[in-house]
Regions:
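Extended alpha-helical, oligomerization-prone segments that build pores/tubes and scaffolds
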Residues: 1-340
Length: 340
């Protein structure tokens, strides 16, 4: 897609990527609507009286068959040569992986991925680099050779990485978008949706972006009335929608918001350089799908494979229960028995 507006290339590029998101929504619109219906059925929302929720029963049966416990890292040398150093390195890597998945709730991430794959049909997780920074001054032992330290160094405002880790993070199936592709290798971009408060936007993207964004109230609690909150409190909880775009073709990562007519880059990464140097660029593997298709990446929910049988079972179960409710209790006895 070419940029036509040469007078304002930033706005033109923003329009291009907003159009990419719209096309991604359109491609999977029918599947998203179907996924919402399946999730509601699983939760029992709108369930008819005397019906039988076979979807919930089947899902709870299949979940432990797909994933039941934390995986155990197994690192081995590719070639079993007489290489003590290689064996030691493999053992160290295996222990590091074991410790890494114990430091956060990796089990929850896997469980949610499997649940999304069983219901709407797509489970997504991503990796995130999480460094812990510490403020330091001029390094010790270099006072004589080093030049006069800057004001920030004298004040102890120079930051160094004190500890770092990589964690897996579950992505809700409705918060993920992708570029066109029949197979995963053809996908050139991915998008992850975030909702950020104004203070978070200011810290991450600066004052200009924070003031240019429109913020809306989240609708998590449908039963809460607006009168419970005054205007001051309401402003504190308003959020704005952002899309984190990983552009594989352009080799960059940036953010999009409908109201800010330009690509948005974090203040600590104004060039959009990818924070992770991954071989396949994206921060996630191919999404988990239980029904594979070599001609399309649009998921097929497992429930669609036995939907007709499930509906038939529900009709039969409903009729049986209605018949039972309509029965009147009667008794019979042998008239030849005078005692009765």
């Amino acid at each position: 897609m070419e940029l036509k507006d040469k007078a304002n290339p930033a706005a033109a590029e923003h329009r291009r990527w907003m159009r990419e998101l719209q096309l991604a929504d359109k491609r999977e619109k029918d599947w998203r609507e179907l996924g919402k219906k399946i999730v509601k059925t699983y939760k029992g929302e709108g369930r008819k009286k005397n019906s039988f929720n076979i979807l919930a029963a089947n899902t709870e049966t299949l979940r432990p068959a797909i994933y039941s416990s934390l995986p155990k890292p197994d690192v081995r040398r590719r070639f079993r040569d007489n290489d003590p150093l290689g064996k030691a390195v493999a053992e160290v890597m295996e222990r590091c992986l074991s410790v890494a998945i114990d430091h956060y709730d990796f089990d929850e991430c896997c469980r949610y991925d499997c649940l999304d794959a069983l219901l709407p049909g797509r489970g997504v997780s991503r990796v995130r680099y999480v460094p812990s920074l510490a403020e330091v001054g001029t390094p010790e032992g270099h006072e004589e050779d080093a030049e006069e330290p800057s004001h920030e160094a004298q004040e102890g405002e120079v930051e160094e990485v004190e500890y770092e880790q990589v964690v897996c993070e579950h992505v809700d199936w409705e918060d993920f978008r992708r570029g066109y592709g029949r197979v995963w290798a053809e996908v050139q971009w991915e998008g992850f949706r975030h909702r950020l408060k104004k203070a978070d936007v200011r810290k991450r993207f600066g004052d200009e972006v924070a003031e240019d964004i429109k913020y809306d109230e989240e609708k998590d609690d449908q039963n809460s009335s607006k009168s419970q909150w005054d205007d001051t409190n309401s402003e504190l909880f308003k959020t704005a929608e952002f899309w984190e775009i990983w552009d594989k073709e352009g080799g960059r990562v940036f953010f999009l918001n409908e109201h800010h007519k330009a690509l948005i880059f974090p203040v600590d990464n104004p060039t959009g350089e990818p924070p992770l140097k991954l071989e396949r660029f994206f921060p996630n593997a191919e999404p988990l799908r239980l029904v594979e298709d070599s001609s399309s990446l649009i998921p097929t929910p497992v429930f669609e494979l036995y939907k007709d049988q499930a509906e038939e079972l529900e009709r039969i179960s409903t009729r049986i229960n209605k018949i039972i409710d309509a029965l009147k209790v009667r008794g019979v006895y042998d008239s030849t028995l005078k005692e009765l």
